[in-house]
UniProtKB/Swiss-Prot annotation:
Protein's cellular compartments: Cell membrane; Cell junction, Tight junction
Parts of the chain that traverse the membrane: 195-215, 224-244, 255-275, 292-312, 320-337, 342-362
Gene: MARVELD2
Main location: membrane
Protein purpose: Plays a role in the formation of tricellular tight junctions and of epithelial barriers. Required for normal hearing via its role in the separation of the endolymphatic and perilymphatic spaces of the organ of Corti in the inner ear, and for normal survival of hair cells in the organ of Corti.
Name the record gives this protein: MARVEL domain-containing protein 2
Position of the Glycyl lysine isopeptide (Lys-Gly) (interchain with G-Cter in ubiquitin) cross-link: K412
Organism of this sequence: Homo sapiens (Human)
Length: 558
Protein backbone atom coordinates (compact mmCIF):
# COMPACT_ATOMS: atom_id res chain seq x y z
CA UNK A 1 0.00 0.00 0.00
CA UNK A 2 2.82 2.32 0.81
CA UNK A 3 4.49 1.54 -2.52
CA UNK A 4 1.30 2.49 -4.43
CA UNK A 5 1.07 5.75 -2.51
CA UNK A 6 4.61 6.62 -3.38
CA UNK A 7 4.08 5.79 -7.06
CA UNK A 8 1.03 8.05 -7.23
CA UNK A 9 3.00 10.82 -5.66
CA UNK A 10 5.72 10.37 -8.25
CA UNK A 11 3.22 10.57 -11.15
CA UNK A 12 1.76 13.84 -9.95
CA UNK A 13 3.05 16.87 -11.84
CA UNK A 14 4.89 19.57 -9.99
CA UNK A 15 2.63 22.37 -11.22
CA UNK A 16 -0.57 20.81 -9.87
CA UNK A 17 -2.06 22.39 -6.79
CA UNK A 18 -4.47 20.21 -4.74
CA UNK A 19 -7.73 21.77 -3.75
CA UNK A 20 -7.46 20.73 -0.11
CA UNK A 21 -4.07 22.34 0.36
CA UNK A 22 -3.74 23.71 3.90
CA UNK A 23 -2.78 27.34 3.99
CA UNK A 24 -0.69 28.87 6.68
CA UNK A 25 -1.51 32.46 5.89
CA UNK A 26 -5.10 33.63 6.24
CA UNK A 27 -4.64 36.38 3.70
CA UNK A 28 -4.27 33.93 0.82
CA UNK A 29 -7.52 32.11 1.64
CA UNK A 30 -9.62 35.03 0.55
CA UNK A 31 -8.61 34.59 -3.09
CA UNK A 32 -11.01 32.10 -4.74
CA UNK A 33 -8.75 31.56 -7.76
CA UNK A 34 -6.58 29.21 -5.75
CA UNK A 35 -9.54 27.02 -4.75
CA UNK A 36 -11.32 26.90 -8.12
CA UNK A 37 -8.35 25.96 -10.27
CA UNK A 38 -6.42 22.73 -10.11
CA UNK A 39 -3.39 24.17 -11.83
CA UNK A 40 -1.27 27.25 -11.41
CA UNK A 41 -1.58 30.26 -13.68
CA UNK A 42 1.19 29.06 -15.98
CA UNK A 43 0.24 25.87 -17.85
CA UNK A 44 3.76 25.22 -19.11
CA UNK A 45 5.39 22.14 -17.64
CA UNK A 46 8.09 23.05 -15.20
CA UNK A 47 11.47 21.35 -15.00
CA UNK A 48 12.03 18.95 -12.14
CA UNK A 49 13.51 20.44 -9.01
CA UNK A 50 17.26 20.10 -8.52
CA UNK A 51 18.43 17.07 -6.61
CA UNK A 52 20.13 17.59 -3.25
CA UNK A 53 23.87 17.33 -3.00
CA UNK A 54 23.52 14.24 -0.82
CA UNK A 55 20.49 11.93 -0.52
CA UNK A 56 18.46 12.16 2.70
CA UNK A 57 18.81 9.39 5.21
CA UNK A 58 17.19 8.34 8.45
CA UNK A 59 14.34 6.13 9.65
CA UNK A 60 11.66 8.82 9.24
CA UNK A 61 12.16 9.12 5.51
CA UNK A 62 10.98 5.58 4.69
CA UNK A 63 7.43 4.64 5.72
CA UNK A 64 7.73 0.99 4.69
CA UNK A 65 9.43 -1.65 6.74
CA UNK A 66 10.29 -3.80 3.72
CA UNK A 67 12.76 -1.39 2.28
CA UNK A 68 16.03 -0.94 4.02
CA UNK A 69 16.85 2.64 4.96
CA UNK A 70 19.90 4.15 3.41
CA UNK A 71 23.02 3.88 5.46
CA UNK A 72 24.15 7.22 6.75
CA UNK A 73 27.51 8.26 5.41
CA UNK A 74 30.40 7.94 7.76
CA UNK A 75 30.87 11.51 8.97
CA UNK A 76 34.19 11.95 10.71
CA UNK A 77 35.65 15.16 12.02
CA UNK A 78 38.27 16.61 9.74
CA UNK A 79 41.50 17.22 11.58
CA UNK A 80 43.89 19.66 9.99
CA UNK A 81 47.42 20.36 11.06
CA UNK A 82 47.10 24.10 10.25
CA UNK A 83 43.82 25.76 11.36
CA UNK A 84 41.67 27.45 8.73
CA UNK A 85 41.85 30.77 10.57
CA UNK A 86 45.62 30.85 10.04
CA UNK A 87 45.23 29.96 6.38
CA UNK A 88 42.66 32.72 5.86
CA UNK A 89 44.90 35.22 7.62
CA UNK A 90 47.80 34.61 5.22
CA UNK A 91 45.55 34.07 2.21
CA UNK A 92 43.64 37.32 2.62
CA UNK A 93 39.97 38.09 2.38
CA UNK A 94 37.84 36.84 -0.49
CA UNK A 95 34.61 38.23 -1.77
CA UNK A 96 32.70 34.91 -1.73
CA UNK A 97 34.57 32.16 0.12
CA UNK A 98 31.60 29.76 0.10
CA UNK A 99 32.01 29.00 -3.60
CA UNK A 100 35.59 27.80 -3.12
CA UNK A 101 34.77 25.23 -0.43
CA UNK A 102 34.65 21.56 -1.44
CA UNK A 103 31.42 19.62 -1.22
CA UNK A 104 32.53 17.87 1.96
CA UNK A 105 32.98 21.20 3.77
CA UNK A 106 29.49 22.54 3.04
CA UNK A 107 27.40 22.64 6.19
CA UNK A 108 23.85 21.53 5.57
CA UNK A 109 22.69 22.59 9.03
CA UNK A 110 22.78 26.32 9.60
CA UNK A 111 24.37 27.93 12.59
CA UNK A 112 22.41 29.35 15.44
CA UNK A 113 21.58 32.56 13.59
CA UNK A 114 18.27 34.21 14.34
CA UNK A 115 15.90 33.80 11.40
CA UNK A 116 14.28 36.79 9.81
CA UNK A 117 10.45 36.96 9.73
CA UNK A 118 8.65 35.84 6.57
CA UNK A 119 7.62 38.33 3.96
CA UNK A 120 4.19 39.88 4.28
CA UNK A 121 1.82 39.06 1.36
CA UNK A 122 0.40 42.55 1.53
CA UNK A 123 3.77 43.95 0.45
CA UNK A 124 4.74 42.32 -2.82
CA UNK A 125 7.73 44.57 -3.30
CA UNK A 126 9.35 43.39 -0.12
CA UNK A 127 12.22 40.97 -0.61
CA UNK A 128 13.23 38.75 2.25
CA UNK A 129 16.92 38.28 2.90
CA UNK A 130 18.72 35.38 1.41
CA UNK A 131 19.44 33.74 4.72
CA UNK A 132 15.81 33.54 5.84
CA UNK A 133 14.98 30.23 7.43
CA UNK A 134 11.32 30.16 6.31
CA UNK A 135 9.68 30.22 2.97
CA UNK A 136 9.03 33.90 2.14
CA UNK A 137 5.83 32.96 0.31
CA UNK A 138 4.04 31.46 3.30
CA UNK A 139 4.40 27.78 2.38
CA UNK A 140 6.46 25.03 3.93
CA UNK A 141 10.22 25.13 3.79
CA UNK A 142 11.47 24.67 0.27
CA UNK A 143 8.10 23.76 -1.31
CA UNK A 144 7.82 24.61 -4.96
CA UNK A 145 4.02 24.87 -5.12
CA UNK A 146 3.87 27.61 -2.49
CA UNK A 147 6.20 29.71 -4.61
CA UNK A 148 3.98 29.28 -7.66
CA UNK A 149 0.89 30.29 -5.68
CA UNK A 150 2.53 33.43 -4.36
CA UNK A 151 3.83 34.34 -7.82
CA UNK A 152 0.33 33.96 -9.23
CA UNK A 153 -1.30 36.18 -6.62
CA UNK A 154 1.53 38.65 -6.00
CA UNK A 155 3.73 38.90 -9.08
CA UNK A 156 7.26 40.01 -8.47
CA UNK A 157 8.27 43.51 -9.28
CA UNK A 158 10.27 43.42 -12.54
CA UNK A 159 11.94 46.68 -11.56
CA UNK A 160 12.92 45.53 -8.10
CA UNK A 161 16.57 45.55 -8.94
CA UNK A 162 16.57 49.27 -9.68
CA UNK A 163 16.64 50.25 -6.01
CA UNK A 164 19.73 48.22 -5.24
CA UNK A 165 22.73 50.22 -4.21
CA UNK A 166 25.60 49.71 -6.59
CA UNK A 167 29.15 50.49 -5.58
CA UNK A 168 30.95 52.02 -8.51
CA UNK A 169 34.69 52.08 -8.85
CA UNK A 170 36.21 55.50 -8.28
CA UNK A 171 37.97 57.14 -11.17
CA UNK A 172 41.59 58.23 -11.17
CA UNK A 173 40.66 61.91 -10.84
CA UNK A 174 38.48 61.17 -7.80
CA UNK A 175 41.30 59.25 -6.17
CA UNK A 176 43.73 62.11 -6.86
CA UNK A 177 41.26 64.65 -5.45
CA UNK A 178 40.76 62.58 -2.30
CA UNK A 179 44.52 62.17 -1.93
CA UNK A 180 45.10 65.92 -2.27
CA UNK A 181 42.33 66.67 0.20
CA UNK A 182 43.75 64.25 2.75
CA UNK A 183 47.44 65.16 2.45
CA UNK A 184 47.27 68.85 1.48
CA UNK A 185 47.99 69.59 5.12
CA UNK A 186 51.57 68.40 4.56
CA UNK A 187 52.22 71.35 2.20
CA UNK A 188 51.96 73.89 5.04
CA UNK A 189 54.56 74.93 7.61
CA UNK A 190 53.07 72.51 10.11
CA UNK A 191 53.45 69.72 7.55
CA UNK A 192 57.10 70.68 7.07
CA UNK A 193 57.57 70.30 10.81
CA UNK A 194 56.14 66.78 10.61
CA UNK A 195 58.55 65.88 7.81
CA UNK A 196 61.48 67.25 9.82
CA UNK A 197 60.24 65.21 12.78
CA UNK A 198 60.46 62.01 10.74
CA UNK A 199 64.01 62.94 9.68
CA UNK A 200 64.93 63.59 13.32
CA UNK A 201 63.62 60.17 14.33
CA UNK A 202 65.70 58.44 11.67
CA UNK A 203 68.84 60.37 12.56
CA UNK A 204 68.26 59.77 16.28
CA UNK A 205 67.95 56.05 15.68
CA UNK A 206 71.23 56.17 13.74
CA UNK A 207 72.93 58.01 16.61
CA UNK A 208 71.69 55.48 19.14
CA UNK A 209 72.79 52.51 17.01
CA UNK A 210 76.26 53.86 16.21
CA UNK A 211 77.02 54.92 19.78
CA UNK A 212 75.78 51.63 21.23
CA UNK A 213 77.91 49.61 18.80
CA UNK A 214 81.17 50.85 20.42
CA UNK A 215 80.12 50.94 24.04
CA UNK A 216 82.51 48.04 24.73
CA UNK A 217 85.39 50.52 24.53
CA UNK A 218 84.02 52.24 27.63
CA UNK A 219 84.00 48.94 29.48
CA UNK A 220 87.62 48.32 28.51
CA UNK A 221 88.58 51.82 29.67
CA UNK A 222 86.96 51.40 33.09
CA UNK A 223 88.41 47.91 33.49
CA UNK A 224 91.90 49.30 32.86
CA UNK A 225 91.85 52.73 34.52
CA UNK A 226 88.74 52.73 36.70
CA UNK A 227 86.77 55.92 37.35
CA UNK A 228 89.80 58.19 37.90
CA UNK A 229 92.52 59.62 35.68
CA UNK A 230 94.87 57.18 34.02
CA UNK A 231 97.73 56.02 36.21
CA UNK A 232 100.69 58.33 35.93
CA UNK A 233 98.79 60.83 33.83
CA UNK A 234 97.90 63.21 36.64
CA UNK A 235 100.88 65.33 35.84
CA UNK A 236 100.06 65.21 32.21
CA UNK A 237 96.55 66.36 33.00
CA UNK A 238 97.86 69.15 35.14
CA UNK A 239 100.23 70.14 32.36
CA UNK A 240 97.38 70.14 29.94
CA UNK A 241 95.33 72.35 32.18
CA UNK A 242 98.25 74.71 32.49
CA UNK A 243 98.35 75.14 28.73
CA UNK A 244 94.62 75.57 28.40
CA UNK A 245 93.62 71.90 28.40
CA UNK A 246 91.26 70.15 30.79
CA UNK A 247 91.05 66.97 32.78
CA UNK A 248 89.50 63.74 31.48
CA UNK A 249 87.97 61.33 33.97
CA UNK A 250 86.44 58.77 31.59
CA UNK A 251 83.96 58.25 28.71
CA UNK A 252 80.60 59.99 28.84
CA UNK A 253 78.75 57.62 26.52
CA UNK A 254 75.75 57.19 28.91
CA UNK A 255 75.11 60.93 28.68
CA UNK A 256 75.01 60.73 24.87
CA UNK A 257 72.61 57.76 24.97
CA UNK A 258 70.32 59.48 27.47
CA UNK A 259 70.20 62.63 25.32
CA UNK A 260 69.48 60.62 22.16
CA UNK A 261 66.75 58.59 23.86
CA UNK A 262 65.11 61.61 25.49
CA UNK A 263 65.13 63.55 22.21
CA UNK A 264 63.76 60.54 20.32
CA UNK A 265 60.84 60.08 22.74
CA UNK A 266 60.03 63.81 22.74
CA UNK A 267 60.14 63.96 18.95
CA UNK A 268 57.82 61.00 18.48
CA UNK A 269 55.32 62.48 20.95
CA UNK A 270 55.29 65.80 19.07
CA UNK A 271 55.03 63.96 15.74
CA UNK A 272 52.03 61.88 16.84
CA UNK A 273 50.39 64.95 18.34
CA UNK A 274 51.01 66.92 15.15
CA UNK A 275 49.24 64.32 13.00
CA UNK A 276 46.08 64.47 15.13
CA UNK A 277 43.02 66.64 14.53
CA UNK A 278 43.45 68.26 17.96
CA UNK A 279 46.73 69.81 16.78
CA UNK A 280 45.18 71.24 13.61
CA UNK A 281 42.00 72.63 15.17
CA UNK A 282 42.97 73.65 18.69
CA UNK A 283 46.73 73.99 19.10
CA UNK A 284 47.38 75.87 15.87
CA UNK A 285 44.71 78.42 16.80
CA UNK A 286 46.41 79.17 20.11
CA UNK A 287 49.09 81.79 20.59
CA UNK A 288 51.32 79.76 22.91
CA UNK A 289 51.77 76.41 21.15
CA UNK A 290 54.07 77.47 18.25
CA UNK A 291 56.32 79.23 20.76
CA UNK A 292 56.24 76.17 23.02
CA UNK A 293 57.25 73.94 20.13
CA UNK A 294 60.01 76.44 19.31
CA UNK A 295 61.30 76.19 22.88
CA UNK A 296 61.25 72.37 22.78
CA UNK A 297 63.26 72.31 19.54
CA UNK A 298 65.78 74.82 20.91
CA UNK A 299 66.22 72.71 24.05
CA UNK A 300 66.77 69.57 22.00
CA UNK A 301 69.22 71.47 19.79
CA UNK A 302 71.26 72.48 22.85
CA UNK A 303 71.19 68.93 24.24
CA UNK A 304 72.37 67.45 20.95
CA UNK A 305 75.10 70.05 20.69
CA UNK A 306 76.33 69.14 24.17
CA UNK A 307 76.14 65.42 23.33
CA UNK A 308 78.11 65.96 20.12
CA UNK A 309 80.83 67.90 21.96
CA UNK A 310 81.04 65.25 24.67
CA UNK A 311 81.25 62.42 22.14
CA UNK A 312 83.96 64.15 20.11
CA UNK A 313 85.85 64.71 23.35
CA UNK A 314 85.54 60.99 24.11
CA UNK A 315 87.05 59.97 20.78
CA UNK A 316 90.37 61.70 21.57
CA UNK A 317 90.08 60.92 25.31
CA UNK A 318 89.97 64.51 26.43
CA UNK A 319 93.13 65.42 24.50
CA UNK A 320 95.23 62.65 26.06
CA UNK A 321 95.73 61.02 22.66
CA UNK A 322 97.77 64.06 21.62
CA UNK A 323 100.37 63.45 24.36
CA UNK A 324 103.15 60.95 23.53
CA UNK A 325 103.24 59.76 27.15
CA UNK A 326 99.69 58.39 26.83
CA UNK A 327 99.60 57.42 23.17
CA UNK A 328 101.60 54.24 23.62
CA UNK A 329 101.09 50.92 21.84
CA UNK A 330 99.21 49.68 24.91
CA UNK A 331 96.75 52.61 24.85
CA UNK A 332 96.55 52.90 21.08
CA UNK A 333 93.25 50.99 21.04
CA UNK A 334 91.63 53.83 23.01
CA UNK A 335 92.87 56.49 20.59
CA UNK A 336 91.84 54.66 17.44
CA UNK A 337 88.63 56.13 15.92
CA UNK A 338 86.42 53.57 14.20
CA UNK A 339 84.17 54.17 11.22
CA UNK A 340 81.00 53.77 13.31
CA UNK A 341 82.22 56.47 15.69
CA UNK A 342 82.76 58.84 12.78
CA UNK A 343 79.22 58.07 11.58
CA UNK A 344 77.90 58.74 15.10
CA UNK A 345 79.60 62.15 15.15
CA UNK A 346 78.14 62.99 11.73
CA UNK A 347 74.66 61.94 12.85
CA UNK A 348 74.97 63.99 16.03
CA UNK A 349 75.88 67.22 14.26
CA UNK A 350 73.35 66.71 11.44
CA UNK A 351 70.57 66.03 13.97
CA UNK A 352 71.59 69.15 15.85
CA UNK A 353 71.25 71.21 12.65
CA UNK A 354 67.85 69.64 11.87
CA UNK A 355 66.53 70.61 15.31
CA UNK A 356 67.76 74.16 14.73
CA UNK A 357 65.89 74.23 11.39
CA UNK A 358 62.76 72.94 13.14
CA UNK A 359 63.01 75.77 15.67
CA UNK A 360 63.20 78.35 12.86
CA UNK A 361 60.20 76.74 11.12
CA UNK A 362 58.26 77.01 14.38
CA UNK A 363 58.87 80.76 14.40
CA UNK A 364 57.67 80.97 10.79
CA UNK A 365 54.59 78.93 11.72
CA UNK A 366 53.88 81.27 14.63
CA UNK A 367 53.94 84.35 12.37
CA UNK A 368 51.88 82.59 9.69
CA UNK A 369 49.15 81.53 12.13
CA UNK A 370 49.08 84.99 13.72
CA UNK A 371 48.56 86.57 10.28
CA UNK A 372 45.81 84.05 9.49
CA UNK A 373 43.94 84.78 12.72
CA UNK A 374 44.23 88.52 12.12
CA UNK A 375 42.90 88.10 8.57
CA UNK A 376 39.94 86.05 9.77
CA UNK A 377 39.22 88.63 12.46
CA UNK A 378 39.18 91.47 9.94
CA UNK A 379 36.87 89.53 7.62
CA UNK A 380 34.52 88.87 10.50
CA UNK A 381 34.55 92.54 11.44
CA UNK A 382 33.65 93.50 7.88
CA UNK A 383 30.74 91.08 7.91
CA UNK A 384 29.40 92.13 11.32
CA UNK A 385 29.88 95.90 10.95
CA UNK A 386 29.27 97.01 7.36
CA UNK A 387 29.91 100.67 6.77
CA UNK A 388 27.20 103.14 5.78
CA UNK A 389 28.92 103.94 2.52
CA UNK A 390 28.63 100.33 1.34
CA UNK A 391 24.90 100.42 2.06
CA UNK A 392 24.50 103.54 -0.01
CA UNK A 393 26.37 101.99 -2.92
CA UNK A 394 23.90 99.14 -3.01
CA UNK A 395 21.01 101.56 -3.68
CA UNK A 396 22.79 103.80 -6.17
CA UNK A 397 21.06 103.75 -9.56
CA UNK A 398 21.07 106.34 -12.26
CA UNK A 399 17.55 107.50 -13.14
CA UNK A 400 18.36 109.33 -16.37
CA UNK A 401 17.61 107.38 -19.51
CA UNK A 402 16.01 104.42 -17.70
CA UNK A 403 12.70 104.55 -19.62
CA UNK A 404 14.43 104.03 -22.94
CA UNK A 405 16.43 101.10 -21.58
CA UNK A 406 13.32 99.47 -20.13
CA UNK A 407 11.88 98.75 -23.56
CA UNK A 408 15.15 97.22 -24.75
CA UNK A 409 15.71 95.33 -21.48
CA UNK A 410 19.24 96.67 -21.14
CA UNK A 411 20.42 95.55 -17.73
CA UNK A 412 22.54 97.86 -15.65
CA UNK A 413 25.67 96.51 -14.02
CA UNK A 414 24.60 95.39 -10.56
CA UNK A 415 27.24 93.91 -8.35
CA UNK A 416 26.00 91.16 -6.10
CA UNK A 417 26.64 91.51 -2.44
CA UNK A 418 29.09 88.97 -1.10
CA UNK A 419 27.47 86.83 1.54
CA UNK A 420 30.10 85.07 3.59
CA UNK A 421 29.24 82.85 6.51
CA UNK A 422 30.43 83.80 9.93
CA UNK A 423 33.79 82.20 10.70
CA UNK A 424 34.37 80.72 14.12
CA UNK A 425 37.92 79.82 15.09
CA UNK A 426 39.41 78.42 18.23
CA UNK A 427 37.72 76.57 21.06
CA UNK A 428 33.92 76.46 20.86
CA UNK A 429 32.51 77.38 24.31
CA UNK A 430 29.85 75.09 25.80
CA UNK A 431 26.31 76.16 25.06
CA UNK A 432 27.28 78.17 22.00
CA UNK A 433 24.56 78.29 19.36
CA UNK A 434 25.90 79.32 15.93
CA UNK A 435 23.96 81.88 13.97
CA UNK A 436 22.07 80.41 11.02
CA UNK A 437 23.02 81.53 7.53
CA UNK A 438 19.97 83.18 5.98
CA UNK A 439 19.69 82.26 2.32
CA UNK A 440 17.52 84.52 0.12
CA UNK A 441 14.45 82.95 -1.45
CA UNK A 442 15.37 83.95 -5.00
CA UNK A 443 18.46 81.72 -4.98
CA UNK A 444 16.32 78.58 -4.88
CA UNK A 445 13.44 80.09 -6.87
CA UNK A 446 15.60 81.06 -9.86
CA UNK A 447 18.11 78.26 -10.52
CA UNK A 448 20.29 77.84 -13.61
CA UNK A 449 18.36 78.37 -16.86
CA UNK A 450 17.98 75.25 -19.00
CA UNK A 451 15.64 76.27 -21.84
CA UNK A 452 14.64 79.35 -23.80
CA UNK A 453 11.22 79.38 -22.10
CA UNK A 454 12.86 79.76 -18.71
CA UNK A 455 14.96 82.61 -20.08
CA UNK A 456 11.85 84.43 -21.29
CA UNK A 457 10.19 83.90 -17.91
CA UNK A 458 13.23 85.31 -16.09
CA UNK A 459 13.26 88.23 -18.51
CA UNK A 460 9.59 88.98 -17.82
CA UNK A 461 10.18 88.92 -14.06
CA UNK A 462 13.12 91.28 -14.48
CA UNK A 463 11.07 93.74 -16.55
CA UNK A 464 8.18 93.58 -14.09
CA UNK A 465 10.24 94.33 -10.97
CA UNK A 466 12.79 96.65 -12.53
CA UNK A 467 10.28 99.52 -12.61
CA UNK A 468 9.48 99.02 -8.93
CA UNK A 469 13.17 99.02 -8.14
CA UNK A 470 13.67 102.29 -10.06
CA UNK A 471 10.96 104.07 -8.11
CA UNK A 472 12.20 102.83 -4.76
CA UNK A 473 15.80 103.60 -5.65
CA UNK A 474 14.99 107.18 -6.67
CA UNK A 475 12.93 107.74 -3.53
CA UNK A 476 15.51 106.24 -1.19
CA UNK A 477 18.32 108.11 -2.93
CA UNK A 478 16.48 111.41 -2.50
CA UNK A 479 15.90 110.74 1.19
CA UNK A 480 19.55 109.82 1.70
CA UNK A 481 20.67 113.04 0.01
CA UNK A 482 18.29 114.98 2.25
CA UNK A 483 19.76 113.24 5.29
CA UNK A 484 23.26 114.21 4.15
CA UNK A 485 22.23 117.84 3.91
CA UNK A 486 20.62 117.72 7.35
CA UNK A 487 23.74 116.06 8.74
CA UNK A 488 25.81 118.97 7.48
CA UNK A 489 23.37 121.44 9.05
CA UNK A 490 23.26 119.55 12.35
CA UNK A 491 27.03 119.48 12.53
CA UNK A 492 27.10 123.29 12.49
CA UNK A 493 24.76 123.59 15.47
CA UNK A 494 26.47 124.46 18.76
CA UNK A 495 26.86 121.52 21.11
CA UNK A 496 27.00 123.64 24.29
CA UNK A 497 24.81 126.73 24.45
CA UNK A 498 24.66 129.29 27.22
CA UNK A 499 20.88 129.48 27.27
CA UNK A 500 18.92 126.55 28.66
CA UNK A 501 16.06 127.08 26.26
CA UNK A 502 18.44 127.04 23.32
CA UNK A 503 19.99 123.80 24.59
CA UNK A 504 16.58 122.14 24.92
CA UNK A 505 15.58 123.28 21.45
CA UNK A 506 18.76 121.82 19.93
CA UNK A 507 18.17 118.56 21.81
CA UNK A 508 14.63 118.33 20.44
CA UNK A 509 15.95 118.90 16.92
CA UNK A 510 18.48 116.08 17.35
CA UNK A 511 15.82 113.71 18.67
CA UNK A 512 13.46 114.57 15.83
CA UNK A 513 16.20 114.03 13.28
CA UNK A 514 17.04 110.66 14.85
CA UNK A 515 13.40 109.63 14.64
CA UNK A 516 13.31 110.56 10.98
CA UNK A 517 16.33 108.37 10.30
CA UNK A 518 14.76 105.44 12.12
CA UNK A 519 11.35 105.84 10.52
CA UNK A 520 9.88 102.33 9.96
CA UNK A 521 8.45 103.30 6.57
CA UNK A 522 11.80 104.53 5.31
CA UNK A 523 13.65 101.51 6.66
CA UNK A 524 11.13 99.18 5.03
CA UNK A 525 11.53 100.89 1.67
CA UNK A 526 15.31 100.78 1.98
CA UNK A 527 15.24 97.09 2.82
CA UNK A 528 12.93 96.44 -0.13
CA UNK A 529 15.32 98.35 -2.37
CA UNK A 530 18.26 96.20 -1.24
CA UNK A 531 16.27 93.02 -1.75
CA UNK A 532 15.19 93.98 -5.28
CA UNK A 533 18.74 94.96 -6.19
CA UNK A 534 20.14 91.59 -5.13
CA UNK A 535 17.27 89.70 -6.76
CA UNK A 536 17.62 91.51 -10.08
CA UNK A 537 21.37 90.97 -9.97
CA UNK A 538 20.82 87.26 -9.46
CA UNK A 539 18.33 87.01 -12.34
CA UNK A 540 20.61 89.01 -14.59
CA UNK A 541 23.54 86.73 -13.79
CA UNK A 542 21.47 83.65 -14.65
CA UNK A 543 20.47 85.14 -18.00
CA UNK A 544 24.05 86.13 -18.82
CA UNK A 545 25.32 82.64 -17.99
CA UNK A 546 22.71 81.08 -20.25
CA UNK A 547 23.52 83.49 -23.10
CA UNK A 548 27.23 82.75 -22.75
CA UNK A 549 26.63 79.01 -22.97
CA UNK A 550 24.37 79.43 -25.99
CA UNK A 551 26.96 81.61 -27.72
CA UNK A 552 29.57 78.92 -27.15
CA UNK A 553 27.27 76.31 -28.65
CA UNK A 554 26.59 78.46 -31.72
CA UNK A 555 30.29 79.12 -32.26
CA UNK A 556 31.07 75.43 -31.83
CA UNK A 557 28.51 74.36 -34.44
CA UNK A 558 29.54 77.11 -36.84
Amino acid sequence: MSNDGRSRNRDRRYDEVPSDLPYQDTTIRTHPTLHDSERAVSADPLPPPPLPLQPPFGPDFYSSDTEEPAIAPDLKPVRRFVPDSWKNFFRGKKKDPEWDKPVSDIRYISDGVECSPPASPARPNHRSPLNSCKDPYGGSEGTFSSRKEADAVFPRDPYGSLDRHTQTVRTYSEKVEEYNLRYSYMKSWAGLLRILGVVELLLGAGVFACVTAYIHKDSEWYNLFGYSQPYGMGGVGGLGSMYGGYYYTGPKTPFVLVVAGLAWITTIIILVLGMSMYYRTILLDSNWWPLTEFGINVALFILYMAAAIVYVNDTNRGGLCYYPLFNTPVNAVFCRVEGGQIAAMIFLFVTMIVYLISALVCLKLWRHEAARRHREYMEQQEINEPSLSSKRKMCEMATSGDRQRDSEVNFKELRTAKMKPELLSGHIPPGHIPKPIVMPDYVAKYPVIQTDDERERYKAVFQDQFSEYKELSAEVQAVLRKFDELDAVMSRLPHHSESRQEHERISRIHEEFKKKKNDPTFLEKKERCDYLKNKLSHIKQRIQEYDKVMNWDVQGYS
